[in-house]
Amino acid sequence: MDTNFKFTRARLMTSAATGLAMFLAGTNFAYAQEADEADAVVAVPADSAAEKTEGDKDAVLDTVVVSGFRQSIANSIATKRTNTSIVEAISAEDIGKLPDNSIAESLARLPGLTAQRLRGRAQVISVRGLGPDFTTALLNGREQVTAGDNRGVEFDQYPSELLSQVLVYKSPDAALMGQGLAGTADLRTVRPLDHGERTVSVSARYEYADIGALNPGSDDTGYRVTGTYIDQFAHDTLGIMLAFADQSSPTQAERWDSWGYPTTGANNDLLLGGAKPYVESRNLERTAFAGTLQYEPTPAFRTSIDVLQSNFKDAGNLRGIEIPLAWSGSSLRPGYETSDGFVTAGIFDNVQGVVRNDYRGRDADVLSAGWNVQYDFNDKWTVEGDLSLSRVKRDDVDLEIYAGTGSGFGNGVSDTLAFMRTGDGSFVFGSQLDYTDTTLFGLTDPQGWGQIGYIKRPKTDDELHALRLSLTRNFDSNFISSVEFGANYTEREKTKASQEAFVRLANPGTDNFQLIPAEYLLANTSLDFIGIPGQLSFDPFRLLNSGLLVQDSNGNNPDVLLKAWQVNEDVLTLYAMANIDTAVDGIPVRGNVGVQYVETDQSSSGPANNAVGVTISDGVKYSEVLPSMNLSMEIADKTFVRFAAARTLARARLDQIAASGGLPGVDTTVALRLLASGGSVDPSDSRSIVLNGSGGNPRLRPYIANGIDLSFEKYFGSSSGYVSAAAFWKGFDTFVDPSSSAIIDYSSILSSLTLPPGAESIPNIQLGSVSGPANFHNGSLRGLEFAASIPADMFVDGPLGGFGVFSSISFTESEVTPDDQTTPQAIEGLSETVGNVTLYYEWAGFEARVSNRFRSDFLGEVTGFGAGRELRNIKGDSVVDAQIGYTFHDGALDGLAVQLQANNLTDEEFVTYLNDDPRQVKDYQRYGTTYLLGVSYKF
């Protein structure tokens, strides 16, 4: 992927984007809030504002009478304005109602942020061009583990209905624990005492996928129900919040997956090697609870307990025909058509397709709990303690079962298949066979793969314990307002393993073929989207448990062994931070300056994939000093310049740290030479290395970056008007090359190796090389961000004043080149251009809005062969959502709201491609539009 950004083009696009933002910009998200919600500025009723004294004006900041979506905007912009850091955030429009159906969708509308979709829904985010692994997640300020294989947060684990705010720090401060290199997303639930009144809110939504139910027995409808109860007791010293969210959401998709593209003919034209087109029907079922207990018996003592528990199930069937073409025994007829070096149409003979009935599922349990205690010794000193747990247990299953006309290529009836490439890069076919014929197709091994099917059961456990202690000293000073210092200690353990087995016929007979009994058959599945009328269908799990099939373990396969690992991280963070509140030449200046000292003990263990029963283990200890500074200067009325500088880190991907790999080979020649000369292994001299292996690198150091941010913000008009421009730069002191080599310690498996006699006495012989990820020290990232929020009530009164627009656009470039290479390396998650536009209207209870978020091509992580994770080029997309609703504010229906939403209104596809060539489409997935009709009631 070309990551060289052209700032000439950027300036042109910026000019256009700024003009567009001034005219067509609006937001359905909220911006920033500081760590203490008491400092947040929110829109309040006019009577509350009138009661404020002159001394309260600085805290109120242009309160206006708004509600719903506009209240969300006003709250956000007010807190962005008062924050000392460079931040973005989302605020709930009302209890249990964030602006979008998912957290990730709302985050993707923030300036400089974007999302990657999975099965049609936004799942993980990138912040300022850096992928999901560079952004950490907190829940109420506490670090969270992840359901994925690595560090990237899958935000669909957290129901948006249970959250009141999501704050994204683009520039950290020293008191922010668990901070990411790109950004830190802090998910927040309601504080019942801060909420200040009894509230009961319930909602229900009906969901419909317009693409239809593509697999027999699947659903294209679903639901979401939520409820929240907030109350205060004992003269407002005890507060409670209880929330519940349950959903059953269908996902229907037409999927095209190519094998790849070899070349053919004298001109080396690209030709489809094979394909796996499917229709996929899944159902996401999630049940979640959240609770908060706040107790403040005296003004000096405060304590709270937070708990969030979520069970997440996402499972369903994929049915399609795997079509081996150029990479099989099939033959391409002469006379095929080509265009621009690509074979676009032709006919294959002797095609033996694999009719597949697959099942894929995920079951994840999320638990987050925390206890916080604060005590004021006096008006100068405050002590705080916080104890927390974050845990995710995930179990996946991936089952595939095959049907065909005969076992092994050349046996059974073959097909003659015409093909034609479509304008979107996928293909359609014309078949001579009837793939629904239950007298022709049976359980077998059509391509001679040695199996009737395969089953994988990956399992991941991730758990983190944290303890934080801090002490704050307040000052009556015109420069330093307070100083905070403290310590944070975390222990994290993540493990992964996979149980896998071949699926074979229990009684294969002589032909390894079994017609499917009628009681296991389902209605046929249509494959019209690829030109094939249909295929036979059955329930793969019911068939697996029928006695017709058996499972044959594949646990000792080297590829399976490599999927098992354990990573442990113990991290001690000491920090100190001074908060600044002063004036310089009459200009108000607020901010902070501080430093973190981070000490990490990192270790990993995992099996050797070429020696059953042998475990490799290694690790490293390291420390880093991370200074930070944030300054906010109000250079004119409602006009701010912000400056931030920080050194940040992001620990490497867990699968890169994982110790699992092959037993190293022994270079006998080098060992004998060192024995003869009395020499020792010198890790800096490859000629003296005796042991050479491959796999992960438990000694991998983190990504380290020095960053500078500069932002200009002008606020005007009502509480929801502003424009901003920001520039940022990060220089990487340390980066990770996934395909390099490094030195690790093989002491744990030295006794399992066959060494020349006496070689174990060679000094440092245990230090050997591993081919895999390694650190290098070169790279940078920089970008520009522009945003504007323009409410129409700046210009007109009355109903027309209900219009508003928000737009943002970001341009980012990177230049990251490994030490031993000359070509820059693409950064995961980096789209050179990211933007969004939202137009909204709200007046007298009626509201409507339409939003478009877009991003250019990028390198993203997807699930690859064998359920492993791999990086792939992903085509940029442009997603349009819309919603309309009405809220009753008086009468018998006061508090009742109805809403209709449409997600992915233009049916934007998800596309990946190979070899930096957009013509070589790997995945093409179409999801259709999802509609939600809902009603909510608050009292």
Question: Where are the predicted features?
Answer:
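Short loop/turn motifs that connect adjacent beta-strands in outer-membrane beta-barrel proteins
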Residues: 176, 192-199, 234-238, 300, ...
